[in-house]
Regions:
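Membrane-embedded alpha-helical segments of inner-membrane proteins
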Residues: 1-160
């Protein structure tokens, strides 16, 4: 995590503020979505997915794997990918803070850093808190979307 943070912060230093803001928001949204996927995989009803698989719904078989392996899926999506997204968003925020400070040298760095940390926390934690009820309510649909994505990737990258 430390080396990833250092590497990404170095990369982020070379990106303009106009590009780093959308990239920052993309990383935050990706973290929120992966957290929702982890929650949905633990909540999804195996019977509903099994019913879709018996009707040959594309991606349902793959979705079944995600539901049956929910503890591992949740661990990867919530913990691993979520932590990586948090680290990346923090690194991007620090890079943006220093860029803003270079544009406005009279602004207090402590104030600017506190504001940056607050924004990162509010967007990340708040976004996850707001998205979790949706993920719980639409667990089967979310897992099916994940299964369809897995199905498509498998078809595109299968060996011939």
């Amino acid at each position: 995590s430390f080396s990833l943070n250092v590497a990404f912060e170095e990369l982020a230093q070379g990106i303009s503020v106009y590009l780093s803001i959308p990239l920052f928001l993309l990383v935050i949204v990706f973290g929120i979505l992966t957290d929702g996927i982890g929650v949905a995989s633990t909540k999804a009803d195996e019977k509903a997915i099994l019913s879709m698989a018996s009707r040959k719904v594309a991606g349902a078989r793959e979705s079944l794997w995600f539901v049956r392996n929910a503890p591992r899926v949740s661990s990867v999506f919530n913990d691993v990918i979520g932590d990586v997204c948090a680290t990346l968003s923090g690194a991007l925020a620090v890079a943006m803070i220093y860029k803003v400070r270079s544009l406005f040298p009279t602004v207090d760095l402590v104030w600017l850093t506190s504001l940056g940390v607050g924004i990162v926390s509010a967007l990340g934690i708040g976004g996850k808190a707001l998205f979790k009820p949706f993920a719980l309510k639409h667990a089967e649909e979310m897992v099916l979307v994940l299964g369809k994505a897995s199905y498509l990737m498998r078809r595109v990258f299968r060996r011939k």
